[in-house]
Every structure is written in structure tokens, then in C-alpha cells.
């Protein structure tokens, strides 16, 4: 990943997390920015571009979706679905965690066939989160 691409991915990551998680203080995301920036280049990341600019991305660690983010100006245009559909073409199973209060994301993944497998409290934020899973034959 080029440095400019990483800058764009990180801008989307920060903006999207702050926007989607109003129930978590912005400082949590800002304090984790450098750590995420360090691990993204070693992760499996697929991007969606519009006119040569990255507008969304999905990051994987094996079959685990570490994140699916779309720039705010490009949300509700099917970009997240396209990124997820692409990953589904070569991953037979997928899983991810989503905060219970992130209703929009929860509904999106439910529409895409994910089911709740477990729930736990995120020890870093104190927020309830769900483990969602998807099997290729579901």
C-alpha cells in the first residue's frame, strides 16, 4: 500500500469510527490511530476507488473482518456491499464484531446473511458487542 493510500484509508477509518460510534468518546479512536496505522500495511486490505480516490475499504485477518468502512460522502451507495460481496467470492466463512449500539452496521450485516453467534463486553470500551458469523452455505 502506498503512503498516500494509507493516509486516505486512515482518514476514512477515523472519520467512520467517530461517525458510527457516537457512544464511544472520540479520544478512543484518536488514541488508537497510530496502532491501526501500523498494522494496516500488514493486513489483507481491499479498497474501492471512485475517480482514482479511495472511498471505502475492507480489512481482513484470515476470515475475520477487522473493519469495513466507507467515506461518509459515499455511504448508502452500495460500496460496502460490493466490498463484502468481493470478499465472499474467496472466503467460505467470515466473522466480525459489531457494537450492539451500532444498529446501522448490525442491520447491514444481518441483511447480508450474518447471524449473531455470541456476545461479550469489549473490555477497552465497556460496550456490548456481538460476534457475527457467515457461512458460505447460509
Where are these regions (language model features)?
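Conserved GNAT acetyl-CoA-binding A-motif
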Residues: 84, 89-101
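Helix-loop element at the rim of GNAT/NAT acetyltransferase active sites that forms part
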Residues: 11-27
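Conserved beta-strand-loop-alpha-helix junction that forms the acyl-donor binding cleft
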Residues: 96-107, 122-128
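Conserved beta-hairpin
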Residues: 44-56
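Conserved acetyl-CoA-binding loop-helix of GNAT-fold acetyltransferases
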Residues: 70, 76-89, 107-111
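Active-site rim helix/loop that mediates acceptor-substrate recognition in acyltransferases
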Residues: 23-45
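A short, internal acetyl-CoA/4′-phosphopantetheine-binding micro-motif in the GNAT/acyltransferase core
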Residues: 64-75, 98-99
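A short beta-loop-alpha structural element at the N-terminal edge
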Residues: 1-11
Amino acid at each position: 500500500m502506498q503512503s498516500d493510500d494509507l493516509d486516505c484509508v486512515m482518514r476514512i477509518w477515523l472519520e467512520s469510527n467517530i461517525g458510527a460510534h457516537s457512544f464511544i468518546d472520540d479520544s478512543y479512536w484518536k488514541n488508537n490511530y497510530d496502532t491501526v496505522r501500523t498494522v494496516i500495511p500488514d493486513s489483507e486490505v481491499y479498497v474501492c476507488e471512485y475517480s482514482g480516490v479511495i472511498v471505502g475499504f475492507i480489512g481482513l485477518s484470515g476470515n475475520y473482518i477487522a473493519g469495513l468502512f466507507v467515506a461518509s460522502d459515499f455511504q448508502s451507495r452500495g460500496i460496502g456491499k460490493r466490498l463484502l460481496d468481493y470478499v465472499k467470492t474467496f472466503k467460505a466463512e467470515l466473522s466480525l464484531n459489531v457494537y450492539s449500539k451500532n444498529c446501522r452496521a448490525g442491520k447491514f450485516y444481518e441483511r447480508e446473511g450474518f447471524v449473531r453467534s455470541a456476545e461479550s463486553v469489549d473490555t477497552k470500551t465497556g460496550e456490548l458487542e456481538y460476534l457475527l458469523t457467515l457461512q458460505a452455505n447460509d
